Curated annotation (Swiss-Prot):
Gene Ontology BP terms: antral ovarian follicle growth; negative regulation of ovulation; neuropeptide signaling pathway; preantral ovarian follicle growth
Keywords from the named record: Cell membrane, Disulfide bond, G-protein coupled receptor, Glycoprotein, Membrane, Receptor, Transducer, Transmembrane, Transmembrane helix
Species for this entry: Homo sapiens (Human)
Lyase as UniProt keyword: no
Region annotation (Disordered) ranges: 234-271, 475-526
Residue intervals on the Extracellular side: 1-35, 91-109, 177-189, 332-342
Lineage: superkingdom: Eukaryota
Designated name of the protein: Probable G-protein coupled receptor 149
Protein's cellular compartments: Cell membrane
Annotated S-S bridges: C105-C182
Amino acid sequence: MSLFLSNLSTNDSSLWKENHNSTDLLNPPGTLNIYLFCLTCLMTFAALVGSIYSLISLLKMQNRTVVSMLVASWSVDDLMSVLSVTIFMFLQWPNEVPGYFQFLCTTSALMYLCQGLSSNLKATLLVSYNFYTMHRGVGSQTASRRSGQVLGVVLTVWAASLLLSALPLCGWGAFVRTPWGCLVDCSSSYVLFLSIVYALAFGLLVGLSVPLTHRLLCSEEPPRLHSNYQEISRGASIPGTPPTAGRVVSLSPEDAPGPSLRRSGGCSPSSDTVFGPGAPAAAGAEACRRENRGTLYGTRSFTVSVAQKRFALILALTKVVLWLPMMMHMVVQNVVGFQSLPLETFSFLLTLLATTVTPVFVLSKRWTHLPCGCIINCRQNAYAVASDGKKIKRKGFEFNLSFQKSYGIYKIAHEDYYDDDENSIFYHNLMNSECETTKDPQRDNRNIFNAIKVEISTTPSLDSSTQRGINKCTNTDITEAKQDSNNKKDAFSDKTGGDINYEETTFSEGPERRLSHEESQKPDLSDWEWCRSKSERTPRQRSGYALAIPLCAFQGTVSLHAPTGKTLSLSTYEVSAEGQKITPASKKIEVYRSKSVGHEPNSEDSSSTFVDTSVKIHLEVLEICDNEEALDTVSIISNISQSSTQVRSPSLRYSRKENRFVSCDLGETASYSLFLPTSNPDGDINISIPDTVEAHRQNSKRQHQERDGYQEEIQLLNKAYRKREEESKGS
């Protein structure tokens, strides 16, 4: 350091005067270029505000990742650039040149060069880190657990940049005055050394960015990661929920970020953890052991993490490319001797522009779907059916909730990857009503298949008298028992099917309509007429068949086909604009029917084994809203619960405002408790509808034993509704 200071004090004159005459041809240091000064001042102010904003925003993040911390260090580089350019502007002010101006020129040039090297090296480091985490089966912890390592890497980059920038103080090269500030002497061989360092960083960044660009920005299908079925069953937490609430998996189209990721081997990958196609299972398991408390795939944190990788890739390429003209100009001037002051000034302004783009990274927290579909022409809805009507192979978790010619399906699926198209049942064609089947009915015990399929159909619902013949297209896959933490095995069976016996006229009328927050038109009430006035419903009509209250949200039939231990319940909730605070809106909810059908115990079942059944529940919900603004806050929550009343599995809510599914926590209640007031205060009905598989098993057993004498709780509820309807008509 003493050597640097001595050289800085004794050699300032030579460092500056060596090439002084070459820089005052058109714009001497004492002449002020008002246009350049004003433009530099504006860009410097923008860089100052942006760097402070991005630094504060990134440091205030609750779940900081390695990517966000590295970008935060970028903001520090931007502040360093602001300081150096501020000195440049001071040097441009017309005045006599005192001795300390030489010191300022050397200091500002050193800082300018140091932040440039640091920014470019960190860009390469960021892209390398993203490439490593996306193509290796290695888990990476959040920055909060590796803050020391991240800080060490950042300090190392800064130290290396400072060392390389300070070489002119040791006698190799010199800093000279320019019309816009100060820069290294381009006639020195030191410029070639800098260009080699930049070229290596640039080449590595471009080489790694090519596969990442396709993976993060231009892939037709976002990367996806299989979470273990048992992990999903335990539930998960989301931002805004207490730590003790468990862990929630959000299963939404946006939350699945890329096509080539594999199952994590039953772990909870971190927000930066993904597994590439070539990663062995052992590597994934080892990564899980290193990080048992990471962020689950599909959660909001995981989605933001993938968005951060997208924005970091774009910013890294932007910063390095904006420095390219300056480096090329320096090399050309060194090799050929050609010097163009306008080109040099323009190159300087581009490097200054590179310091103003860092705040764009903060957008990754909210705009998780960008830049796909916006900056890059990506296929935003990778779950829609191809226009040519061909079947699209689907794998892993799949979701689709749409209105297309009065027909829409929402699916949840979980399976291992199948390479054979004909063995994959997870495709969806909205234009026909063919059954989705699997052609491999019996698989070896080494193959694992766990599937949950939820269908939300907006086609006309069937009366209770016709429900028995619904499940006509059914195939069953025998699954392998998976070993749990207690080394006990549960056999899961999956029964898939759907309400597909609908008239063709259902699919030939009306244009395509999709649930989207961009749609400002209100639903045509005539489209919903079929959903009212059924035998087990309370009609919501006035005279003239007009709704008493405007209809909003969603109404239809929900069908669940699940392995043993799962059933489905559906309810509606009011959600805040941020999509995190969930408040039950009990006054706006009316459940008309929740009836389990197709509950058939296994014929080979014995009292000593766990009952293996396939439960199918139809739950119809009609929500009545008092105001039109509720359209932006209404969500549909499908809750899949286990037989245990103490364990709740993930729940999904569909937000019309956000146009996607997100996860939520509904608490530990395992049943609906409905209070039905009647005209007689003593005759009020309070019914508890079970929401567990075990309760449905008991109901099914009693129904087979007692035959006509037994009624489920939901049947009592329907009876109460009819009684209330008769009382209202009588009055």
